[in-house]
Structure formats: structure tokens, C-alpha cells
Amino acid sequence: MDTIKIFNHGEFDTIRNKLVNLLKVVKWNTINSNVTVSSTDTIDISNCIREILYKQFKNVRNIEVSSNISFIKYNRFNDTTLTDDNVGYYLVIYLNRMKSVKTLIYPTPETVITSSEDIMFSKSLNFRFENVKRDYKLVMCSISLTYKPSICRIQYDNNKYIDISDSQEGNNLCYCVITMDPHHLIDLETICVLVNKSGKCLLVNEFYTRFRKNHIYDSFADLCMDHIFELPDTEELFTLRNDDGRNIAWDNDKLESGNNTWIPKTDDEYKFLSKLMNIAKFNNTKFDYYMLVGDTDPCTVFTFKVTKYYINLNYE
């Protein structure tokens, strides 16, 4: 999320009454100060908050909600009662949305954001409350978010979604959008392949038009020789190599030998591929360069721009 998120659709209405009821139990413990409560009741409330936040944020791997809930009475809140660092977020929930209490947040010394809605903001920001005087009108708790390294999610079938990531970790296939620099031996402009962790390449589409036949090559160099250059039987005369010993999709320490590759077979799988193609078509600003060298004299160098989308599919 950004440094500030305002919840203005009553996202926390379901737990507002729980907080009011909790306040009835603990209010007598203090007269003129903020009070922080931690109990089995606050653990239940924290779990409810966590479930609500999971629905609000995409690509979140983990959400931690502190079971310490602070009821705020003064305009200025001494945050040392909540946390001793500035990592993560504060969540402010108003006990009564009809009151005139406001949260004032200062992203910069010259800028102030004012809200009367439930709000979540980075602990690194300066803030204060306005019109918090005679009674407890809001609560605060500490939130920690851990995000997946994910670009988006695509529906795979009726019961499953697949994360599309720019990270190799935890994934077993890479969808590569490959754009070739102009060369007199190359007629294609863009080609897309699925590369598994052994380096095998499934030709998916060219010019963003999907292939129906499943063409699988042992390496990207083989794919180039057979499909791009159309020189399948000239290995004795002309070969391709990457001088750095790199794979087009995977770091060398991620490569595994002998892996089968995923092949689309069902309508759901072909629909998934089509969705992946569309995502890649409009989200390809980040790319790496990959070069293949032909053993001519002098050497022929082919340069490719590669945008990579990592996924994890279960297959045998």
C-alpha cells in the first residue's frame, strides 16, 4: 500500500461494536490518559481486523495485527506505548463515525492530510488527532504487511488463482516476452516462450498470436535455430551460444536437470495462457538483455530484450 490508506466504506463497521463493548470493560482503569489493552478479547478483534485487511490489499503474503489495542483520549498520542520502531503502519478506527474527531497526518512539513474516516498510515509519518477530549473516541493498533513479489493474479480454473511474479523464488516456469533487435537473419519481432527450470522452451506465441501446436525445444538456442532462423539442420556449420553461460530465464543456481515442462491441454489452461499473454502485452516496461553469439568469422551477435513473468504450476 501507499503510506496512507483511508477506509471510507465502513470496512470496519463489523468490529466497531466489539471495540465499544471492550471499552466498557476497561474504561474504569484510567481517568485521564490513553489506555492500551491486551487480552483474549483483543486477540479476537485483531484476528477480525486481519481478515478485513486481507480483503483490502492485493498480493499480501502476511498481515500481522498487534493484539495491543490503544484507546485514545488526548489530542497527541505517545506512540511509545504501542511500538518502539517506525516499521509498519498504524490503523485508526473511530468508535463513532458520527463524531467530529479528525486524524491529521503530515507527509511533509508543508502538507497535511485530514480524515474523519478509519485510516491506516505509515509509522514514519508525523500525526496528531483533533477534537479528542473528554471521552475515548478512537482506537489504534499496530499493523505489519509483508507483500508477495507479485505483479498480479490470474484465474487458472474455477477454484484456483496463479500469482504472476517478477521473482524466481518459489516458481517453476517463466513466461518470456522476447523482442529481437533488427537483424537481416530475423523476420520476427516478438516471440513468447514458457521456460521451465531445465531450460526447455515451449513456444507459446509470436506477434501475440497464440500457437495451438505445442512446440518444445531443449533450449532457447535450439528454438532460435529451428524456428527463428529456420536453420534446424546446420549445427555442424553454425551454432549459437551465450558467452556468459546464462539461461534466458533462470539464474544458474535455479536450474534443475531433467524437468518435464508444462503443456496446456484443457480449455481452462488455454484461457489461462491467453490471460497471461494479455498481462504481458501491456506490462512489459521492465526487461533484461540477452545475447546469443553465432560462431561465424567475425562473430554474429543477436541481441534480445526479455521481459520475464514467473509462475508456479503443479504438473508432472
Curated annotation (Swiss-Prot):
<dbReference type="GO" id="GO:0030430">
    <property type="term" value="C:host cell cytoplasm"/>
</dbReference>
<protein>
    <recommendedName>
        <fullName>Protein C4</fullName>
    </recommendedName>
</protein>
<keyword id="KW-1048">Host nucleus</keyword>
<comment type="similarity">
    <text>Belongs to the poxviridae OPG031 protein family.</text>
</comment>
<dbReference type="GO" id="GO:0042025">
    <property type="term" value="C:host cell nucleus"/>
</dbReference>
<keyword id="KW-1035">Host cytoplasm</keyword>
<comment type="function">
    <text>Plays a role in the inhibition of host NF-kappa-B activation. Mechanistically, blocks the subunit p65/RELA translocation into the host nucleus.</text>
</comment>
<dbReference type="Pfam" id="PF03336">
    <property type="entry name" value="Pox_C4_C10"/>
</dbReference>
<dbReference type="InterPro" id="IPR005004">
    <property type="entry name" value="Poxvirus_C4/C10"/>
</dbReference>
<keyword id="KW-0244">Early protein</keyword>
